[in-house]
Amino acid sequence: MPELPEVEVTRRGLLPHVVGRRIAAVTVRHRGLRWPVDPQLEMRLAQRVVRRIERRGKYLLLECVSEAAGEPAGWLLVHLGMTGTLRVLPEAPSPGAHDHLDLVLAPGPGAALGTKPGTIVLRFRDPRRFGAILWSTLPEAELPSHPLLRTLGIEPFDPAFDGAWLHRHTRGRSAAIKTVLLAGGIVVGVGNIYASESLFRAGIRPTTPAGRLSRARCDRLAQAVRETLAQAIERGGSTLRDFVGSDGASGYFQLDCLVYDRAGQPCRVCATPVRQIVQGQRSTFYCPNCQH
């Protein structure tokens, strides 16, 4: 499942090709995604210009503005689900069975420098159809109140996210710290791979009740979360099965994993065999010697 690093890699890959371009045509082939695609999406997006691409948690937010006077800006919310990708294509090759939406993008008044002339295609592909493409006309100031965004925790790269924040928001929580990280209500984007890796770097056993973490351990964990996610973004995310970036390239962070998917193999620090357990129906990996 694409997590924060994969979504951020996608966002950064789209920026130089998509921002400033005009949506010349929209093709929706399958509307039955996680939530039905707006039946009027083609009309709503027609001739709008993509002004910005932001990210909130695992959602991509494309701000689409109209050149018509008085028409408010809108936001295309994209969630990649478990197997979704957004690809930039120089032309529109014949679609496959899982290619659900195309945006044909023509050069616009503010197209980024260095992009190729002529039209390009932004294609959404999702074999399992757990992704989502939604339209919202909420003003930017009210966008955090969108039903899909309002319960999300702080961004891990927000300066306010630190050990003090983590310590304060885990008080009274009896759930295991890995479970709390995956829930996303305290901090977003720490998916299954990155939770195991962050907890290893912080020296914290994933079954530790969140409310029992000391301030010092929260300091280490907050730093480990930021470092792990930053490294994953630098490596293009993790490709375990389906994920590719906007240019079709796979991610390579999985090659750097210290404990994830290494059950029975020696810990890279102490050589103790890595253990695998199940928490909330998700596999967890840890070193019983390095993590307490």
UniProtKB/Swiss-Prot annotation:
Domain of life, per lineage: Bacteria
InterPro entries in alphabetical order: DNA_glyclase/AP_lyase_DNA-bd, DNA_glyclase_Znf_dom_DNA_BS, Formamido-pyr_DNA_Glyclase, FPG_cat, MutM-like_N-ter, Ribosomal_uS13-like_H2TH, Znf_DNA_glyclase/AP_lyase, Znf_FPG/IleRS
Pfam families in alphabetical order: Fapy_DNA_glyco, H2TH, zf-FPG_IleRS
Residues that, per the record, bind DNA: H98, R128, R173
Catalytic reactions on record: Hydrolysis of DNA containing ring-opened 7-methylguanine residues, releasing 2,6-diamino-4-hydroxy-5-(N-methyl)formamidopyrimidine; 2'-deoxyribonucleotide-(2'-deoxyribose 5'-phosphate)-2'-deoxyribonucleotide-DNA = a 3'-end 2'-deoxyribonucleotide-(2,3-dehydro-2,3-deoxyribose 5'-phosphate)-DNA + a 5'-end 5'-phospho-2'-deoxyribonucleoside-DNA + H(+)
Keyword annotations from UniProtKB, A to Z: DNA damage, DNA repair, DNA-binding, Glycosidase, Hydrolase, Lyase, Metal-binding, Multifunctional enzyme, Zinc, Zinc-finger
Active-site residues (renumbered): P2 (schiff-base intermediate with dna), E3 (proton donor), K58 (proton donor), R282 (proton donor)
Zn-finger segments (FPG-type): 258-292
GO biological process: one example: base-excision repair
This enzyme's EC code(s): 3.2.2.23, 4.2.99.18
Cofactor: Zn(2+)
Manner of cofactor binding, per the entry note: Binds 1 zinc ion per subunit.
GO molecular function: 8-oxo-7,8-dihydroguanine DNA N-glycosylase activity; class I DNA-(apurinic or apyrimidinic site) endonuclease activity; damaged DNA binding; zinc ion binding
Family the UniProt entry places it in: Belongs to the FPG family.
NCBIfam families named among the record's database cross-references: fpg, PRK01103.1
Role of this protein: Involved in base excision repair of DNA damaged by oxidation or by mutagenic agents. Acts as a DNA glycosylase that recognizes and removes damaged bases. Has a preference for oxidized purines, such as 7,8-dihydro-8-oxoguanine (8-oxoG). Has AP (apurinic/apyrimidinic) lyase activity and introduces nicks in the DNA strand. Cleaves the DNA backbone by beta-delta elimination to generate a single-strand break at the site of the removed base with both 3'- and 5'-phosphates.
Subunit structure: Monomer.
Name the record gives this protein: Formamidopyrimidine-DNA glycosylase
Natural source organism: Cupriavidus necator (strain ATCC 17699 / DSM 428 / KCTC 22496 / NCIMB 10442 / H16 / Stanier 337) (Ralstonia eutropha)
Gene name tied to this protein: mutM
